[in-house]
Amino acid sequence: MAQPASPEERSGLTKLLWFGIIQIVGMVVGWISVFSIFGLQFSNFPGLSRLPRNATQAQVSAALGPFFQNFSLIIPVDIAVGLVAAVVLTMGLRDMSKVDGPKFSVPWKLMLLLMIGSALAGVSGYLIFNALPAIIAQAPTTSRTPSSAFFSAIGSLLLAGLVAAIGGLLALIGLIGGEILGLWRVGAKYDETLLKLGAIFVIIPLLNITAPFLVLIGAYQVKGRLERPM
């Protein structure tokens, strides 16, 4: 008869279940927020429709400002949900490393890079969206020299972009070496195809929408098998 699951295995798989649930909830909240903001801005927001035919940059900036500010609110929410999911997955992979250290010690540590990189990219993205209206308003026309405020805003934007790029690189390393590799190895350890598919789909556009569902179902099936050893 197969060995019963250890407490660490049960704990790790339970955290994988919660990882999938949190990602699904975050995805739903994110889509609702995006559609709500676009609907409010372009259907009910009067600023854009009231712009004169030859609107100045300041007028365009004032009209688009609320859109950029509202859209920037999605970033902290998305990053916060993503970080919570990453923390849960990190704890789950760390539990699994107590059962099989060679397979899971590296992925759970690389998950830390994913969290750090996501936080850096999220903060930078928030600053970029908030700075865009001011840059539009201060952008020079053909008849005047750029102001010092414009150069200052551009400098801040470039710095935020650099930090976002660094954060994105760290997040990518963590995503591949931490989340994808970790989920794949859990699927390989327990011969669960859905977990391995979920790991692959994480990085594929459009298919990544299905990844949390595959991880959730796969972890549930593995946990069920371990709790009822044959």
Predicted region positions:
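Membrane-interface extramembranous regions at the lipid-water interface
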Residues: M1-G155, A171-M230
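Extracellular-loop-to-transmembrane junctions of the mid-late helices
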Residues: G161-L172
